């Protein structure tokens, strides 16, 4: 477990800023304590200073997980967000997409969101912008990337892809053995 290097921090914050913009500072400067990001086994964990001090008493090879896993670095040093970060991304999301009840199950199985399943979309969402996907009851389901802008979505045919799937809460069941 170690602090992130400058390149790792930059890569992670660039990815997070696609979803929550300037609200990144709200993740670190919280009223309930100081939180930080730490790297362990190529995974980035979001952890309070209090838990971090307790985790230093455990040997590095015995430590499986601590805090909340936000994502991991690939072998090419690109940062990939995990679904475990959804609870922290959803309240601060700048761009949101709501899916109809019939399209929820399809999204939770790992499929993209089609125009026919789109309930609402935040105004001024640009193409390839990171979005958090919600059910119509405002329950966060996952996140993805907008395939089309808000303006283009109005003119699309029903079978066109609106949001590219990246992660969803169904991964807790599909990949339960690899999530830490």
Swiss-Prot record:
Subunit structure of this chain's protein: Monomer. Interacts with pre-ribosome complex. May bind to RNA. Interacts with NOL8. Interacts with FTSJ3.
Entry protein name: 60S ribosome subunit biogenesis protein NIP7 homolog
PUA domain sequence ranges: 94-170
UniProt keyword annotations, A-Z: Nucleus, Ribosome biogenesis, RNA-binding
Source organism: Xenopus laevis
Purpose: Required for proper 34S pre-rRNA processing and 60S ribosome subunit assembly.
UniProt region (N-terminal domain), positions on chain: 1-92
Gene3D superfamilies: 3.10.450.220, PUA domain
Assigned protein family: Belongs to the NIP7 family.
Entry's Gene Ontology molecular function annotations: RNA binding
InterPro entries in alphabetical order: NIP7_N, Nip7_N_euk, PUA, PUA-like_sf, PUA_sf, Ribosomal_synth_fac_NIP7, UPF0113_PUA
Region annotated C-terminal domain, chain positions: 93-180
Record carries keyword Hydrolase: no
Major subcellular location class: nucleus
UniProt GO cellular component terms: nucleolus; preribosome, large subunit precursor
């Amino acid at each position: 477990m170690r602090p992130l290097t400058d390149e790792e921090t930059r890569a992670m914050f660039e990815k997070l800023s696609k979803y929550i913009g300037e609200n990144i500072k709200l993740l670190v400067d919280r009223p309930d304590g100081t939180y930080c990001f730490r790297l362990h086994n190529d995974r980035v964990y979001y952890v309070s200073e209090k838990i971090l001090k307790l985790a230093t008493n455990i040997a590095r090879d015995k430590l499986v997980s601590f805090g909340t896993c936000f994502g991991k670095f690939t072998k090419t040093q690109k940062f990939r967000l995990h679904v475990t970060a959804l609870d922290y991304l959803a309240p601060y999301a700048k761009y949101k997409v709501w899916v109809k009840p019939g399209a929820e199950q399809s999204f939770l199985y790992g499929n993209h969101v089609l125009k026919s399943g789109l309930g609402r979309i935040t105004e001024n969402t640009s193409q390839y912008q990171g979005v958090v996907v919600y059910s119509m009851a405002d329950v966060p389901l996952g996140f993805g990337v907008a395939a089309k802008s808000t303006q283009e979505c109005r003119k699309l045919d029903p079978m066109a892809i609106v949001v590219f799937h990246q992660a969803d809460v169904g991964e807790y069941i599909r990949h339960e053995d690899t999530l830490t």
